[in-house]
């Protein structure tokens, strides 16, 4: 491991010390709580939408969230380890077969829907043996 990788790993550990980042993937509906500073006031703003892309590059990791606001599509790019992000909450898991969902930009309404990923729960060993 070279010096740059070591420094990036330490920086990621420092930035994630007080917050947890859940595992999410493209197709998931997430709520990103963003710290917004307006003058001398600081507040948390929730931004909810579908993750259409995720870029895993260590400290430079980012993701794009798309939502429909007043009939217009709005996309916002977030840095995963940014101090402006107060928290990320996964609201719904999406079942998609692509890593980048840029095709959703041309779609609207029912054709832009994403199937929900259903997680099968493992049966206890006692029930499975019978």
UniProtKB/Swiss-Prot annotation:
Gene3D superfamilies in the record: 2.30.30.790
Family matches, as InterPro entries: Ribosomal_bL19, Ribosomal_bL19_CS, Ribosomal_bL19_sf, Translation_prot_SH3-like_sf
Species of origin: Cupriavidus metallidurans (strain ATCC 43123 / DSM 2839 / NBRC 102507 / CH34)
Pfam families in alphabetical order: Ribosomal_L19
GO biological process per UniProt: translation
PANTHER family from the UniProt entry: LARGE RIBOSOMAL SUBUNIT PROTEIN BL19M, RIBOSOMAL PROTEIN L19
Highest taxon of the lineage: Bacteria
Free-text function comment from the UniProt entry: This protein is located at the 30S-50S ribosomal subunit interface and may play a role in the structure and function of the aminoacyl-tRNA binding site.
Keywords: Ribonucleoprotein, Ribosomal protein
Name assigned to this protein: Large ribosomal subunit protein bL19
Assigned protein family: Belongs to the bacterial ribosomal protein bL19 family.
Any one GO molecular function term: structural constituent of ribosome
Gene Ontology CC terms: cytosolic large ribosomal subunit
